[in-house]
Amino acid sequence: MQPVYIQRIASIHPQGNHSQGNNPKVNDSPDVSANRPFLQACEPDYKDIIANATLRRRMSRIVKMGVACGLECMGELSPEKIGGIITATGLGCLVDTEKFLNNLLDNEERMLNPTPFIQSTFNTIGAQIALIHQIHAYNMTYVHRGLSFESALLDAMMKIEEGSENILVGAMDEMTETSYIIQQRLGLLKGIEAGEGAQFFLLSREAGEHPLAEIRGLETFTGQHTTEEISSRIIRFLQRNGLECQDIQWLVTGKNKKQSLQGDYHEQITNSIYEELETNLFPESIHLSFKDECGEYPTASS
């Protein structure tokens, strides 16, 4: 697959870091996660990014996060040069979904306001970015749970290989108090610190003058695999790209490090696989977990 270059990055996530591309616009918002049981994204002043006050007022929180990230990531690039907008989400616009369902119950299925339903659809964010800049290019949204972002990234890389010059790809998910309570009752958050966030990347065919990074390859696989099978697939992936395990300087994983005496068995097994890979496959690499910064959510890998 042809190498792809990351030209700009925009991110809204917990701990007050809002990095936008090569010229970051940092918002010194206070950490809003202190009084919540999950990591909440610290949001910028949207007036500086989404100029239309009427449009901004109608947007839900996650829509504003995603649209702001997308617009900042585009920067000064002309809309005509965008070959596609590809977004990913695991659960979509939860606040609007909850609002619509509550109205459905409160009003006994009569005289419903359609706006929350319209805003709750998964493709809202990609569509809003396209409408704001009148981008008539390819527009796709992936809702593949934990593989949503990887699916969007793969699609973007394939579009560039087919001839597109620039692709805007992003991922976003939000956590609400209702969603947190439901997931907690279902036992999905044992030993896990929940989070949320929105990220966008401007990918291009050409390296340009100051690319942030180069993506040489991507591989995903699902299902139940032993540590040996996973190790074998990683080794083959590296070899296809002309690398060996000892060449890897940084190993960034999705290991959850929150300790719990009643931790989920599946999460313990997953963490044990990460630890075996760190010990046996990449012992000389620097080991990091991105979930320490953003928490756990379907598109946290972005």
Name the predicted role of every residue range.
Residues 168:
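Short aromatic-hydrophobic micro-motifs that form the base-stacking/packing surface
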Residues 1-138, 143-150, 158-164, 172-302:
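Conserved "HGTGT" condensation-loop signature of ketosynthase/thiolase-family condensing enzymes
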Residues 155:
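Internal active-site segments that recognize and position negatively charged phosphoryl groups
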